[in-house]
């Protein structure tokens, strides 16, 4: 306890806790993200992680053990009544996706899977049963996000990308700068891991073990796939676009963002204003940024006086994102204010496509993002359509129809079956 008075969201959540009306959250997925959610939820007043769905109950038990120190809170439930009883008893039900998304006691479902197919099936089912959906599954958002948002509107519930990941953290800066009337020149993230387009899980087992990560998930970051997905999510929520296929990804440090990610006419690398991009320069990761332009002499004068920069371009930088740890705040805001943190526009302006990591033969089965077949590659929607590129979120489990050479984009004629 401290002498700090609760204000705003913390105050409102504490009131719900006192009234016995916590925001009840069900989590689909019990991996690293699910474990973070259970742990963070335990620390929050007015928020209750009350159910986890998984095909591997032992991983949900491990998540609960990490959060609480033992498994006393865990209750496995294979019936609807059993799950309801577990929640009413103040325990965390370990159950199936279907039982979780249809349970009447759950207010918000968080998709923590990273699998687009899960979103297509169970996130929609959750909304059909009156649940709000918070998406940590950014791969699904860039594949079917506009559809899920449309269905949420139709069903009278809320669909939102979760707080804490780079897209929603960057959105905070974009909204801040836009509300102040600045022109958004570029927005994006610093890349956390060294970029290796050829990365495969077998090469990263040791590092993944050391970092308590799934090797496939680590490779999704290393080969650039995650960055492509995240920047596409920002594009499709704002209308900002990739300047070139795959974006520039310059080596621009924090102090150089407003010199590099600006139009070429002013010494930068961009052909236009209003783009998403990422940087591998020092001091930006694990944060996000927005580069803006001011034109009024008074604003430029004050920015100089405030040591923001000489102008007319300025970089605003959020030096952190807390990933899974921030996501319960989205669920709380939905329940308390009825507002999402981030939603896709009705029509996407960018697509995440796939580029072969190795030569692929006809008849091979496409594996998952972060494995050995392909990496993600973001381009403008019209470029994707012209190339007949397959959205990366649709590839897993499909068949290679024609030979694909390493470095080639996967087109509709090549896969799926």
Task: Locate predicted features.
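Short, ordered loop/turn segments at secondary-structure junctions
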Residues: 30, 55, 114-115, 131, ...
């Amino acid at each position: 306890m401290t002498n700090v008075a609760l204000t705003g969201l913390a105050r409102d959540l504490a009131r719900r806790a006192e009234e016995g009306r916590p925001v009840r959250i069900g989590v689909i997925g019990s991996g690293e993200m699910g474990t973070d959610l259970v742990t963070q939820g335990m620390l929050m007043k007015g928020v209750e992680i009350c159910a986890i769905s998984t095909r591997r109950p032992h991983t949900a038990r491990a998540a609960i053990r990490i959060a609480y120190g033992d498994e006393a809170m865990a209750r496995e439930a294979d019936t609807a009544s059993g799950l309801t009883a577990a929640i009413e008893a103040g325990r965390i039900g370990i159950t199936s996706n279907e039982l979780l998304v249809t349970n009447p006691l759950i207010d918000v479902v968080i998709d923590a899977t990273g699998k687009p197919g899960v979103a297509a099936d169970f996130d929609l089912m959750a909304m059909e049963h009156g649940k709000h959906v918070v998406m940590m599954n950014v791969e699904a958002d860039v594949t079917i996000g506009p559809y899920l948002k449309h269905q949420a509107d139709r069903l009278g519930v809320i669909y939102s990308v979760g707080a804490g990941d780079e897209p929603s953290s960057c959105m905070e800066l974009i909204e801040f700068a836009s509300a102040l009337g600045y022109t958004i020149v570029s927005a994006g993230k610093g890349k956390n891991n060294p970029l290796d387009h050829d990365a495969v899980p077998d090469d990263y087992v040791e590092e993944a073990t050391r970092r308590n990560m799934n090797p496939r998930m680590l490779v999704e970051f290393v080969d650039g796939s995650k960055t492509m997905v995240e920047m596409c999510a920002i594009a499709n929520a704002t209308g900002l676009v990739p300047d070139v296929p795959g974006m520039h990804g310059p080596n621009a440090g924090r102090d150089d963002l407003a010199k590099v990610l600006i139009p070429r006419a002013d010494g930068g690398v961009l052909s236009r204003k209003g783009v998403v991009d990422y940087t591998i320069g020092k001091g930006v990761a694990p944060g996000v940024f927005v580069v803006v332009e001011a034109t009024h002499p008074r604003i430029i004068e004050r920015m100089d006086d405030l040591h923001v920069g000489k102008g007319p371009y300025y970089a605003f930088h959020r030096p952190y994102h807390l990933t899974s740890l921030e996501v319960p705040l989205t669920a709380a805001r939905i329940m308390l204010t009825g507002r999402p943190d981030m939603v896709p526009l009705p029509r996407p302006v960018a697509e995440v496509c796939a580029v072969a990591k190795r030569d692929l033969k006809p008849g091979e089965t496409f594996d998952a993002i972060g494995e050995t077949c392909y990496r993600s590659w973001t381009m403008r929607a019209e470029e994707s359509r012209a190339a007949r590129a397959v959205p990366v979120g649709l590839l897993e489990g499909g068949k290679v129809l024609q030979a694909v050479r390493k470095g080639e984009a996967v087109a509709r004629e090549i896969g799926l079956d």
